[in-house]
């Protein structure tokens, strides 16, 4: 079993805490201090791997190598960013990471209308309601997202 880990700079849950959960052997993570379109170096990938492995876990996959908007929109400079994306995937593979979750969502990357909807068993989950999004003014939507991040990136 794996858990999502937002990195030592951004996650309030440490790898040591994750390691204490019975059955958890790895994490799904990413390089949060890189910009879309930037090539991930093997050194940066290796440093992330070493940090996770030092805690007794492994990187089960990456979510995600963010796709530059030039690729999503077919802009004239898209080929440059496609080449960078390919290099990122090659570097990940060379460092032994074989799973990448792809994210091609435009503009807001991902959007949820609730970050902690309570479920019947008392646990919480992310939720998305299209009617709530349709009723939002785009500027108010951005303000809501920016102001309600609850510690997430």
Ranges and model annotations:
Residues 71-153:
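Active-site acidic/histidine proton-transfer and metal-coordination neighborhood
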Residues 21-42, 63-74:
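N-terminal substrate-binding region of glycoside hydrolase catalytic domains
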